[in-house]
Amino acid sequence: MFSPNHTIVTEFILLGLTDDPVLEKILFGVFLAIYLITLAGNLCMILLIRTNSHLQTPMYFFLGHLSFVDICYSSNVTPNMLHNFLSEQKTISYAGCFTQCLLFIALVITEFYILASMALDRYVAICSPLHYSSRMSKNICVCLVTIPYMYGFLSGFSQSLLTFHLSFCGSLEINHFYCADPPLIMLACSDTRVKKMAMFVVAGFNLSSSLFIILLSYLFIFAAIFRIRSAEGRHKAFSTCASHLTIVTLFYGTLFCMYVRPPSEKSVEESKITAVFYTFLSPMLNPLIYSLRNTDVILAMQQMIRGKSFHKIAV
């Protein structure tokens, strides 16, 4: 950054979760295990969806993209974090910090609207089952994932530009384990009012708008389920939504604790703990939640283990 009072910033220092060398080695093992489980679980989910003919439906199409986003999401932060656990120089380049910040915002927003698309899919499946094939056609499904990717990356790029347009001086120590907006803003020595307002508006809008779509979809879904006379029918209809509802609750619950508030020293410290959950645990748990609660996925896994599901990969 250019300023008459300081030199160009070329790198930042990530303070991470702790400065205790012994604890860092323990955390390295813990987060490495979480990362490997995340990669294995989500890659397995993508492989199952692409190779098993019974999973070639809109619901699993969206789930495959959710798994892909979770892999990118975790991979954006974890490798650098693991490196810093074992390194004395806990630095990240200016370009690397910009990229990490951009990808983090972009992938979070993308996941918002993929989860919203999944809710719409469940709404159509339960409330309009006779029109499901036409209303959730391949073209519509492609649009429902393409738009979140495009919008997410445009939002991430614009928000990152606002952040890195700020002048940074004095300490360049980021009080976090990745390049997050709130602690970066606290390092700035230029006016941050526009950036703070933009962050609050964008985070608030995307959280509330995507959650509104999900809640409205489930309002109609529950109304339709309660009209089903048989208990078995109600249970079967609700079971198709249970995994998605669990993921939505975990993901949105933690994010609401972090971004819908102005940045402060206290909020940054709290957000580090919150961020551990949705950056590492949520991507690891998502495929497990769908696997344990979904008979189609369990059956597909059994078929894959027996070597019966490796047909031609669907395009």
Swiss-Prot record:
Name of the featured protein: Olfactory receptor 5M1
Entry's localization field: Cell membrane
GO biological process, one term: sensory perception of smell
All ranges on the Cytoplasmic side of the membrane: 47-54, 121-139, 218-237, 293-315
Positions in the Extracellular compartment: 1-25, 76-99, 161-196, 259-271
Positions of transmembrane segments: 26-46, 55-75, 100-120, 140-160, 197-217, 238-258, 272-292
CDD domains in UniProt: 7tmA_OR5M-like
Highest taxon in the source lineage: Eukaryota
Keywords assigned by UniProt, alphabetized: Cell membrane, Disulfide bond, G-protein coupled receptor, Glycoprotein, Membrane, Olfaction, Receptor, Sensory transduction, Transducer, Transmembrane, Transmembrane helix
Family: Belongs to the G-protein coupled receptor 1 family.
Record-annotated disulphide pairs: C97-C189
Gene symbol of the encoding locus: OR5M1
Sites where a glycan is attached: N5
Organism: Homo sapiens
Main location: membrane
Membrane association type: Multi-pass membrane protein
Pfam families named in the record: 7tm_4
Annotated GO CC locations: plasma membrane
Function: Odorant receptor.
Gene Ontology molecular function: G protein-coupled receptor activity; odorant binding; olfactory receptor activity
